[in-house]
């Protein structure tokens, strides 16, 4: 075999292996999503975004107990090309750069496979604003969380109402009617 043919066969083989590996990774990722977090069967995936930012906690006192309580997320949302798509903030609310906004309410929460990370969620959209990219979303999954958990200490009588920001990232999958 000539050098060019060997090079071509080797390159083609590597491309096929990479393609098969990427399919296996995609299948594995879908298989790892717990059944309780699956969207309704009459919905389809509309959009996938990656969030990078902070979970903001406030030190609160209830019945002489001190706990870090989630105040709000504060994150930027990026599309698959890593372009800034919008932001995620209190509500919880997701807002696209086109002005579309959805607010949701957690329906299901499951511990993250990473014990140091915030839970995975299935969120039901409760309100819409605008007619852009998020207008058709009715269900949102929060998966692949990294970080964001409330501190285990530091909330006491000396720190009541103090806020702390904990870095996190997550993938958000937006679903809507087929």
Located regions from the model:
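Bacterial N-terminal signal peptides that target proteins for export
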Residues: 2-12
């Amino acid at each position: 075999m000539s050098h060019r043919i060997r090079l071509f066969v080797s390159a083609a083989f590597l491309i096929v292996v990479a393609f098969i590996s990427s399919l296996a990774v995609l299948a594995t990722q879908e298989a790892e999503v717990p059944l309780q977090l699956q969207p309704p069967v009459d919905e389809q995936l509309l959009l996938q975004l990656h969030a990078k930012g902070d979970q903001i906690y406030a030190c609160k006192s209830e019945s002489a107990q001190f706990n870090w309580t989630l105040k709000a997320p504060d994150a930027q949302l990026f599309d698959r090309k890593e372009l800034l798509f919008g932001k995620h903030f209190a509500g919880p609310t997701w807002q696209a750069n086109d002005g579309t906004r959805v607010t949701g309410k957690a329906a299901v929460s499951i511990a993250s496979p990473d014990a140091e990370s915030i839970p995975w969620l299935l969120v039901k959209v409760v309100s819409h604003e605008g007619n852009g990219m998020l207008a058709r979303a009715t269900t949102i999954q929060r998966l692949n969380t990294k970080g964001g958990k409330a501190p285990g200490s530091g909330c006491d009588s000396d720190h009541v109402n103090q806020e702390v920001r904990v870095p996190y990232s997550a993938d958000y999958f937006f679903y809507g009617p087929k």
